[in-house]
Amino acid sequence: MRRYLIPPEALRAVPPGGRRQRPGQARSAAAPHGLLRGHWLLRSTRRGGWLGACLLALAAPLAQAEALWLDDAGRPRAATREAVRWLTDAEQQGLRPQDYDASRLASAVADAELAAPSPDAAAQLDESLTRQVLAYLSDLRHGRVDPARIQARYDSATAPAPDLPTVLREAVAQGQLQDAQRAALPPWPQYADLQKALVHYRSLADHPAWGKALPALPGGKLQAGQRWAGLTTLAERLQALGDLPEAPATAVTAYDATLQKAVQSFQSRHALPADGVIGKSTLDALAVPPAARVQQIALAMERLRLTPLPAAPRFVTVNVPEFTLRAFRNDAGSVREDLQMRVIVGKALDTRTPLFDEDMLWIEFSPYWNIPPSIARKETVPTLRRNPGYLAAQGMEFVSASGVSTDVTPQNLDAVMAGQMRIRQRPGPRNALGDIKFMLPNNQNIYLHHTPSPGLFSRTRRDFSHGCVRIEEPVALAQWVLHDQPEWTEARIRQSMGRPRPVTAKLLEPVPVLMLYQTAVVDGGKLHFVPDVYGQDAVLEKALKQPRPAPAATVTPVTRVPAAPQPVPARAGASDSIAAQ
């Protein structure tokens, strides 16, 4: 079910009977308030302007409110300096101060502390600061970009999102401004860990360990006991990154066991074989400057903002570039990881696993594999034309409305190519799905399943599938999913995986499954970086660089509630579609 992050107050903008207003129809009091102008949600055409009307209804009460930041004399209130610090320090949250006119507002507030501005200038300053603080809180909670522009679609039901204007007003009134920021933070536990890592890596910007390049390796690689001119610099970098407990007191002359252990820690955090040998890949990873890692962490934080935390008591995530599945328990917002395993995802070249979410509804043991028509036409039929014996060797058969056939004839092959027949693989040891699949119905035919080739899980990079997700420990996941059905014991699960015919177990409650894309992850208290195998970080980075509506260049008087609708400026390059949050 699609859902949109709209506060209850805004929903009251829907006319009786739920009819959605068309753009330009009469609305409630206000035109687009400054805090909403240019927001991608407002520019929707697919939903007939209904969502825009809801947001406008939310803006009007805020526009009519008393000044938040200035007292009756036009002087800044106690919370004003803290609000300005949020904007000027936005980089600490992976955001950009220039997006919130931080420098100009900081100067204006400093001037107002020295001398009260005119009433018109005070009104403009208060409105501008309110607009930018709310933009900051909204970006902090929901992200800066339309998810559709980064090829992601998430529809899972979530807990109600905070009404940020109300939260802000109450926080200012109670003298607890920090409550507003806490309410706006994304609910993913991972977010706080990434934010701490971001602050640390930002502190390394001018660290002397990156002041000079590491020299070439002797013989192309460095092993235990060898000498190398870069050892002291290596030790300094590893210490700064947290892999080496403390930097050596004296110059390092040999690659000893302490340094080797630190390198193994570094390698395991950077998706490299943790063998302690420094080769080209490890040297390249060591050469990445902290600023590049800061950007990588910031992109991971942005993706968490764009990804809804499911309200369901249990959910599963697959982090595609990390090749990792995690199963979580959600107890009223307190999220705990129960299970983690390696996975294989779609090939980066041509069969990428899409980024979306869907509910798992049942498990099928000993499944048939109904070969997708595209795979049958491109791969299976050409193979059968060359080697008709391949059908029997792989336990396959032709299926049509008239029945099942195992005859590899030109007529049957032509029927498959024409879409009049399909090929399926019977349950058994050669079945491409292994002996179990976890069904999450979707129009992309993506699901989780086992594999007859478990040896691939030992690879560091694991993008080998046609798009579905192959899981390493299917029994453990089945037990976790069926936890509320005690009759499904481990023995019964394993027995069902060896049947000659499919066996189905329906879930009592749907389990959301989310396909994520995080190249920076905190796992077990350690920050891990993984390669951008699908190039999606570059896509998000490009979207974030798109211009936003320009802030006012000068301080001018404003009307708090405009009397007539004003055009909403479109953000350059943005999509007109609404993506469900």
Task: State where each predicted segment sits.
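Sec-dependent N-terminal signal peptides
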Residues: 46-55
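N-terminal signal peptide c-region/cleavage motif recognized by signal peptidases
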Residues: 59-62
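Intrinsically disordered, low-complexity segments enriched in Ser/Pro/Gly/Ala and basic residues
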Residues: 27, 43, 127, 574-576
